[in-house]
Amino acid sequence: MSETRFHGARVRESTGLATAINDVDSSVIGIVATADDADETLFPLNKPTLLTRVSDVLGKAGTKGTLYKSLKAVADQVSTKVIVVRVPDASSQGAPDTGVTSFGHLDPEDRAFFGIDESEDAHPVYPHKTQDQYVIGGTDGDGNYTGMYALLIAEQDDAIGYRPRIIAAPGLDTEAVTKSLCVIAEKLRAFVYAGCHNCKKPADAISYRARFNERELMLLWPDFIAYNPKSGANEVFPAAAYACGLRARIDHEQGWHKSLSNVPVTNVLGISSPVFWSLQSEDSDANNLNNKEITTIIRRNGFRFWGNRTPETKAYIFEVYTRTAQVLADSVAEAQFETIDAPLTPANVKDVLSAIRAKLDALVTSGRL
């Protein structure tokens, strides 16, 4: 039998390269807001809307509610992707009922005309909800997500395709809303920035903070004072909105490993309540707030957030601890999509492990780990 010999070099191309692990986009913001006078086409109720250039749509955000101030605060810090869910403003819907039918003011003849059942088995009508109900949302009778739950479907929406990683409901963040946002954040591997609702002084904020222990949360106190071009006056703007914008800017410029603290906030004039701070003072308001895991605001070459902690006091005590864990988990997991359901061969296992090692080495080299 003859033999065929080749005296040279053969080159074969292969596409079976090791899987590259890329960082997920951690700078996408998700905001729940009210604005009954906003453009209804651009901002439909209870549906996520993607904004790629926030400054271009400020004129359509209305002047009522919280939407304009939230978007203005973000736009002053960064140009990034923002997913907005607009919800009804309860103050313009009338007071919520507490057990009396919405026809309780009608005469008996009118009740009969409208076919109202006044028997003991009749269910009362609740035409209006509280603001917390609108903001938190859930699912309606048709199975559609409403309120903050609409953020869960943003990534699967053909018109959006992004997952919010920084979420807030500026100006609407009551205790119930903040706790619900943390539930959404856990599902999305996102991080929540929220104010200390209705707290007028440091002691109030410290008392309020005792109600939380979520690792996906940073509590902020007080709020900012900024100029409102719509009204022509200096007004209170929610700190949570600025935190979202600044967080996205830091992610763009430095990375998710850098905390929110000690970075100048753009285009603010003051703070809504006085805070005593001195760099070397251990008994200052700022240090007392920080000791209770509340991020405050100081004035030093401009205004800056001051504080790094979450209300979780055992493992994920810092904002960057939580966000690093989130980004690493999602970056590694998303890169393995093609290997799911593939044969568990030694080559595939080696590919997965080598890609993870290479990614971790790269993060250490770049100073992110």
Task: Annotate the PLM regions.
Residues 2-58, 62, 66-341, 352, ...:
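A glycine- and small-residue-enriched flexible loop/hinge signal that marks low-structured segments
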Residues 346-369:
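C-terminal hydrophobic structural anchor segments
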